[in-house]
A protein has these predicted regions:
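Carbohydrate-binding surfaces of carbohydrate-active enzymes
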Residues: 38-39, 43-221
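Aromatic- and acid-rich polysaccharide-binding/catalytic face
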Residues: 1-34, 87, 191-196
Length: 221
């Protein structure tokens, strides 16, 4: 993530629960998946230190959810992404593709019914939710997103899994976190998390001493 951010002005995510570890174990419109897009996009933006947005999201069609559930899922994803300073969200895709005979629509049934519009061009509930949210967001700008703690993702761990579940647990505990890798300069904070350390290669000595100094100055680890 950090390497990519050095060469691009913005980072983007494709947060599909079905294809993402730690997400494909709950129904679509439940807490874990409602926060997936926001958590992954904040991880990219925080670690990369650049703006990030949800460049492609969707329900993957009726094989995973009804049209109404997909709309509820999108509404949660929009609100959570907006509240967490994710800079935009694009839904895949514009139209259902039930009449196309070529690949990937011939190969994979899941690809045929992903649109905001049905084949007859009638709008699905997801399109209505997208329109309602866009009109609301234009009238309701939010203040700067406040973070209460820095979550340090250490070396030789499942950084996405640890970061994602730390994000969810922090939400349930009533605070918000900012991400960084252990090999990045320590972000200033009064509250640090160093969750789920594993193995013998966790954090460099100089970064650890920097963290201990922050604790001596009053921060909580």
């Amino acid at each position: 993530i950090a390497d990519q951010a050095e060469t691009t002005d913005i980072l983007c995510t494709h947060p599909y629960p079905l294809f993402t570890p730690h997400c494909r174990i709950d129904p679509v419109n439940t807490m874990r998946n409602a926060f997936h897009a926001a958590a992954e996009t904040r991880l990219y933006g925080d670690v990369g230190n650049v703006p990030a947005f949800v460049e492609e999201a969707g329900s993957l069609g009726p094989c995973l959810s009804s049209e109404r559930v997909a709309a509820d899922y999108l509404r949660n994803m929009l609100w959570n992404s907006y509240a967490h300073d994710c800079r935009g969200l694009l839904w895949w895709c514009g139209h259902d593709q039930t009449e196309l005979p070529h690949t990937p629509y011939d190969w994979v049934g899941m690809e045929r019914c992903l649109g905001l519009l049905r084949t007859d061009r009638s709008p699905k509930p997801v399109m209505e939710e997208l329109g309602k949210f866009g009109r609301m967001a234009a009238k309701l700008p939010l203040p700067a997103f406040r973070r209460d703690a820095v979550c340090i993702l250490s070396q030789h761990q499942d950084q996405w899994g640890v970061g994602y579940l730390s994000f969810l647990l922090a939400k349930q505990a009533g605070f918000d976190i900012e991400f960084q890798y252990a090999d990045q300069p320590l972000k200033p904070s009064k509250f640090y998390l160093l969750p789920s350390v594993t193995g013998t290669w966790v954090i460099s000595r100089h970064r650890w001493m920097e963290l201990l100094h922050a604790v001596e100055e009053g921060a909580v680890l």
